Amino acid sequence: MLAHSTAQDLILQQRSSDDHPQTNPRQTGCGAFIILSSVIAAISGLLVGYELGIISGALLQLQSLLELTCQQQEIVVSALLIGALVASLVGGCLIDLYGRRTTIIFTSILLVFANLLPVVVVSYGSLIAGRIFIGVSISLSAIATCVYIAELSPQDKRGMLVSLNELMIVAGILLAYICNYLFASVNNGWKYMFGLITPLAALQAVAMFFLPRSPRFLIMKGYDDAAGKVLQKLRATTDINEELTAIKSSIKAEYQYKFLDLFCSRDNMRARLLIGLTLSFFVQITGQPNILFYASTVLKSVGFQSTEAASLASTGIGVVKVVSTIPAIFLVDKIGSKTFLCIGSAVMAVSLVSVGLVSLQLDVNYNNICKVHTVQNHSLQDSFVYGPVALAKHNESLFEETGTWLESTKASYHSTSQNGTKLLHVSAPEDSSFGFTVKEPKVKSQSDEIPEYMKWLCLSSLLAFVAAFSIGLGPMAWLVQSEIFPAGIKGRAFAITSSMNWGMNLLISLTFLTLTEMIGLPWMLFGYALMSIASLVFVIMFVPNTKGRPLEEISKELANRSYMCNAVCHRRRSKKKLTPVALIQSPA
């Protein structure tokens, strides 16, 4: 998810302290108290990942229980994103106003309430409300947790401790998929899916009361003495004056830029923002949110017929996300973020084309990917019988279609209502030539069965797509953004790119099932593949190579107003370094 707005805050805080290395003291030491504090705070990451992944399996039961239409399923999924988008716009202000620790406590309590709401009040409305509150909770906690851990950690251990949150996110997604499988065949299993995580959220809220406030937040509020005491406890040393001075200098640097500078030519900030927004755009437009939210639904449609099989297959996606994230975290400094972005985008394109080609052979299975198959909503020709026929009260179009069709066959009929359900009483015409017969259930022939190799080819391609995203656009898009913006305006720049991220996530998730019904899943996948190719081209042309380079050097390169033009014209300043020395030396 995302939806990966959490990853952006992770990388932001991991790198922000390095923007002015000459002013930051070397903070050493990573005692048990710091590790414990980081683990407790990082539980928020587990909660975020769980909430992003659990709806995939819950929808398989909810769509039949609540008779959800295609559009209603999209709204259920997108409700979380609506809440997250709204929260992302004000999240930075809230954590600065009330504090990082207080925000985490609030979001944990809100998450408990939001998960229990649809369980206690089983209705479509309560489900939507609960998902919106969950979106608000995970968006705020994503920001607050990473900031809190980064501000507690010593500089030399900050990357490792903040990365713990990202690992917890993918672990939460895996946990959600496992729960989807375990409760797939349980009666009202969706209630267990929603309720299982609430005790952990409640325990985190209680545990956070015993952890210290962020020293940076205390200094921002003028409590320098309290901040000094917290640092002494965290660093196990009395010499904290140098670090206090560095924190104050960092806070002062944030006021050198104004928000509107992001849209101006100062230091070529407008071009930098364009790069950041485009990367956020590609994170979502390549289809990753739909693989996350609709994994079980899609896998069920390609031949994993039972709910349990689809949920088990989607669990593999969670495993791959966890395994793939580890090398991305530990090898990025050696390989480089741009290389990971290129490899990830290329593999994503190939994987999506593979799934699309397979799905062309199974098009009939995708046409009804999100329809509710109940007795009341089967097609007229497939379920028509004589006598009373019950039609769902919300299915006006089918009722009108039935009456029109019966009039054309000269059959007699009349309608009544019983307990809110329309009953259509049909009598066969005297002339049997009209062909009124009760159809026998269709028995699927062996030729209609989906070949095993196609099912597993589709699954393996989806796993390759997830792995490619987890080493590419997933974490690296936010890493690049953390390196292209100056420290003084980085937080405000991330607020804009975060809004783009959540907004595109909302748009993609809200339209996936509808567009799939309109054009078919194969063409949706081909469209995502095309966007992956576009992402590859964009990265090659416009994203700077940041491997092993100081942030000051990267910023200096991007500050050149002709940077974008030079990229389009394939002119790179590095070529000047390849000029033989003999050609520029004067003759002796």
Curated annotation (Swiss-Prot):
The chain crosses the membrane at residues 29-49, 75-95, 104-124, 132-152, 159-179, 192-212, 273-293, 312-332, 340-360, 460-480, 493-513, 523-543. Signal peptide: none annotated. InterPro entries: MFS_dom, MFS_sugar_transport-like, MFS_Sugar_Transporter, MFS_trans_sf, Sugar/inositol_transpt, Sugar_transporter_CS. It comes from the Eukaryota. It is found in: Cell membrane; Endomembrane system; Cytoplasm, Perinuclear region. One of its GO terms (biological process) is D-glucose transmembrane transport. Residues 1-28, 96-103, 153-158, 213-272, 333-339, 481-492, 544-588 are cytoplasmic. Glycans are attached at residues 377, 395, 419. Its main location: membrane. It catalyses: D-glucose(out) = D-glucose(in). It is a multi-pass membrane protein. One of its GO terms (cellular component) is membrane. Keywords: Cell membrane, Cytoplasm, Glycoprotein, Membrane, Sugar transport, Transmembrane, Transmembrane helix, Transport. The keyword Cytoplasm applies. Insulin-regulated facilitative glucose transporter. Belongs to the major facilitator superfamily. Sugar transporter (TC 2.A.1.1) family. Glucose transporter subfamily. This is Solute carrier family 2, facilitated glucose transporter member 12. It comes from Xenopus laevis (African clawed frog).
